[in-house]
Amino acid sequence: MLMPKKNRIAIYELLFKEGVMVAKKDVHMPKHPELADKNVPNLHVMKAMQSLKSRGYVKEQFAWRHFYWYLTNEGIQYLRDYLHLPPEIVPATLRRSRPETGRPRPKGPEGERPARFTRGEADRDTYRRSAVPPGADKKAEAGAGSATEFQFRGGFGRGRGQPPQ
């Protein structure tokens, strides 16, 4: 599809920076939400990504009316060459997440945190303890119950059925 080079470059830059691209399956959407400041239509994003997919530079997933594209290693190399980027710059999906360097958490008595029950856990534990009294036989209680005589009465309106005996 013919599209302005500035739109293609804006799409490729965002894809390389994030490592992923998401687009709603709507060809009539006037602007892609992440590229609204550059005035890029959603159709251009979909077609540029379709082109990259056909060359094997992105993997495509589709769910709930949204396309999800993930860069492959070949796609990273292609975009690096196309956008003239140095090898030190990598997409956000390949960067290591640094552990949080917040303040140290205070320790409780004996260096451990006290055990806390939320409402759901406490209810669940009491239910499990009181469900079967100690010494009761679960297998004797399982089964059809107290009804010892069964009656089978035809098949829910299919056919005439048998007369009662």
From Swiss-Prot:
Pfam families: S10_plectin. GO terms for molecular function: structural constituent of ribosome; tRNA binding. Methylated by PRMT5. Methylation is necessary for its interaction with NPS1, its localization in the granular component (GC) region of the nucleolus, for the proper assembly of ribosomes, protein synthesis and optimal cell proliferation. The modification Phosphotyrosine is found at residue 12. Keywords: Cytoplasm, Isopeptide bond, Methylation, Nucleus, Phosphoprotein, Ribonucleoprotein, Ribosomal protein, Ubl conjugation. InterPro entries: Plectin_eS10_N, Ribosomal_eS10, WH-like_DNA-bd_sf. Residues 90-165 are annotated as: Disordered. One of its GO terms (biological process) is ribosomal small subunit assembly. The modification Phosphoserine is found at residue 146. The keyword Cell inner membrane does not apply. The modification Symmetric dimethylarginine is found at residues 158, 160. The modification Omega-N-methylarginine is found at residue 153. Residues 97-128 have a biased composition (Basic and acidic residues). It is found in: Cytoplasm; Nucleus, Nucleolus. GO terms for cellular component: cytoplasm; cytosol; cytosolic small ribosomal subunit; nucleolus; postsynapse; presynapse; ribosome; synapse. Its main location: cytoplasm. Component of the small ribosomal subunit. The methylated form interacts with NPM1. Component of the 40S ribosomal subunit. The ribosome is a large ribonucleoprotein complex responsible for the synthesis of proteins in the cell. Belongs to the eukaryotic ribosomal protein eS10 family. This is Small ribosomal subunit protein eS10.
